[in-house]
UniProtKB/Swiss-Prot annotation:
Keyword Ion transport: no
Protein name in UniProt: Circadian clock oscillator protein KaiC
Domain comment quoted from the record: In the homohexamer the 2 domains (called CI and CII) self-associate to each form a 'donut' layer; the compactness and local conformation of the domains varies over the cell cycle and impacts function. CII has the autokinase and autophosphatase activities, both CI and CII have (weak) ATPase activity; CI has the clock pacemaker role.
Residues the record lists as binding Mg(2+) 1: 54
Catalytic activity, reaction form: L-seryl-[protein] + ATP = O-phospho-L-seryl-[protein] + ADP + H(+); L-threonyl-[protein] + ATP = O-phospho-L-threonyl-[protein] + ADP + H(+); ATP + H2O = ADP + phosphate + H(+)
Binding locations of ATP 1: 50-55, 90, 225-227, 229, 231, 241
Chain sites annotated for binding Mg(2+) 2: 296, 319
Cofactor(s), by name: Mg(2+)
Gene name of the encoded protein: kaiC
Length: 521
């Protein structure tokens, strides 16, 4: 994602339209800022309470010291230095060690617990001088100030505090340091800052949000402004992991992954034939249909085939437990437990509501990075779509499919439709365009009996069987049979039997059209 870590300024600083930047090494942040934060300028980080402002400020300093050996200064107006150091330990950052090494200095400007009385006119002259002294003494190149909102809350004269904040920003710019200044806002979508600080710190503005969408909260980061340089527009989802902030720059993803002509087996011989010899390696397959149509069975056969060939595979299940998946698979002659014992299969089961979509995406990426599978399956996408917006869900699917293709992994996903019989939409969340192959499964009623139908609805770059075939499920798995040759309107859910005379008449018409075409030629 980033350039190789180096202490040389040549590799840590970037020039974009005359503005030099320093990489933050925060996952995804350097992508959406097109190279990091502008050097020698102050960036305002605004957000409501709990959005991760302080975390971003601390991570910015820690990474600068760790990766580039840039000394840093942290000015705190809210938390005590002890709390900041203790909280950083949760992410594996030993701030006390770098403080002892003289690479980080924490300047405590937090309120006096015994209270304080302001006599006469208020100014930050003494604090500004302390900050300048610390910058010069420790040769600090990076500064984080958290948070200027606390200064306004301590003193009544807001206009005077604005003036003093402006003086502080001007001094930081004069000293040539790259700084982050956090501020709090009241609403997720409203004024940038609570006290109009953005009027003075307007070169660069980053907005962090934690919005309740549907039934779940969703964190996003937006680069509102980077004066004099380019950046990506819009909101980008992020999550907070054990390593700190992790942004998913979905808009930065490029369609540059390689495409293989190699085929892999689905684990079902007849389905391979319907797909022209199997699925393309590195492709994304979607099986969609009502509950009970056999989607999980197809996924199980797909994973079994991969493990049979010595490939590693991961199943991310969001509807069934490990025990239930293993039991059901065993009833079809598939031994998931044996595959796990051999180290070829990994089953990961969790409720969709246990985390946000960004957290699920991060877990999927981490597990893939650690286990290095050739095949993955998600059962099912529709479970993850519950309680979230279409846009958030689509971004999640793009993130998963993009990462799978980048890692050259074949993905098999399932989607449960609401409609039990008949035609159903597979484009409600716009995921059909993201997948390479779509397999439609559905129930059909023929002569008073319920049957199952399977159809390869779409397959990019390959011939595939257009027929709608009947299939059944027994103890050995799925059995795909011939097409419903004597029926039409299967997909609509209202199959109609075609009589022999009608078939002959249709054949005669087709022959007549062909003969007429040949005569004209």
């Amino acid at each position: 994602m980033n350039e190789p870590i180096s202490n040389s300024s040549k590799k840590t600083e970037n020039t974009t339209q005359g503005v030099r930047k320093i990489r933050t090494m925060i996952e995804g942040f350097d992508e959406i800022t097109h190279g990091g934060l502008p050097i020698g300028r102050t960036t305002l980080v605004s957000g409501t309470s709990g959005t991760g402002k302080t975390l971003l400020a601390v991570q910015f300093l820690y990474h600068g010291i760790k990766y580039f050996d840039y000394p840093g200064l942290f000015v705190t107006f809210e938390e005590s230095p002890t709390d900041i150091i203790q909280n950083a330990y949760s992410f594996g950052w030993d701030l006390q060690e770098i403080v002892d090494e003289g690479k980080l200095f924490i300047l405590d400007a937090s309120p006096d617990p015994d209270g304080q009385e302001v006599v006469g006119s208020f100014d930050l002259s003494a604090l500004i001088e302390r900050i300048q002294y610390a910058i010069n003494k420790y040769k600090a190149q990076l500064v984080s100030i958290d948070s200027v909102t606390a200064v306004f809350q301590q003193y009544d004269a807001a206009s005077v505090v604005r003036r003093e904040i402006f003086r502080l920003v001007a001094r930081l710019k004069l000293l040539g340091v790259t700084s982050i200044m956090t501020t709090e806002r009241i609403e997720e979508y409203g004024p940038i800052a609570r006290y109009g600080v953005e009027e003075f710190v307007s070169d660069n503005v980053v907005v962090l949000r934690n919005v309740l969408e549907g039934e779940r909260r969703r964190r996003t980061a937006e680069i509102l402004k980077l004066r004099g340089t380019t950046h990506m527009k819009g909101e980008y989802p992020f999550t907070i992991t054990n390593d700190g902030i992790n942004i998913f720059p979905l808009g930065a993803m490029r369609l540059t992954q390689r495409s293989s002509n190699a085929r892999i087996s689905s684990g079902v011989k007849t389905l391979d034939e319907m797909c022209g010899g199997g699925f393309f390696k590195d492709s994304i397959i979607l099986a969609t249909g009502a509950t009970g149509t056999g989607k999980t069975l197809l996924v199980s056969k797909f994973l079994e085939e991969g493990c049979r060939q010595g490939e590693r595979a991961i199943l991310f299940a969001y509807e069934e437990s490990r025990a239930q998946l293993s039991r059901n698979a065993f009833s079809w002659g598939i031994d998931f437990e044996e595959m796990e014992r051999k180290g070829l299969l990994k089953l990961l089961c969790s409720y969709p509501e246990s985390a946000g979509l960004e957290d699920h995406l991060q877990i999927i990426k981490s597990e893939i990075s650690e286990f290095k599978p050739s095949r993955i399956a998600i059962d099912s996408l529709s479970a993850l779509a519950r309680g979230v917006t279409n846009n958030a869900f689509r971004q999640f699917v793009i993130g998963v499919t993009g990462y799978a293709k980048q890692e050259e992994i074949t993905g098999f996903f399932t989607n449960t439709t609401d409609q039990f019989m008949g035609a159903h939409s597979i484009t409600e969340s716009h995921i059909s365009t993201i997948t390479d192959t779509i397999i439609m499964l559905q129930y059909v009623e023929i002569r008073g009996e319920m049957s199952r139908a399977i159809n390869v609805f779409k397959m990019r770059g390959s011939w595939h069987d257009k027929g709608i075939r009947e299939y059944s499920i027994n103890e050995s798995g799925p059995t795909i049979q011939d097409s419903f040759r004597n029926y039409e309107r299967i997909i609509s859910g209202s199959p109609t039997r075609i009589t022999v005379d009608e078939k002959n008449e249709l054949s005669r018409i087709v022959r007549g059209v062909k003969d007429k075409t040949l005569d004209e030629e």
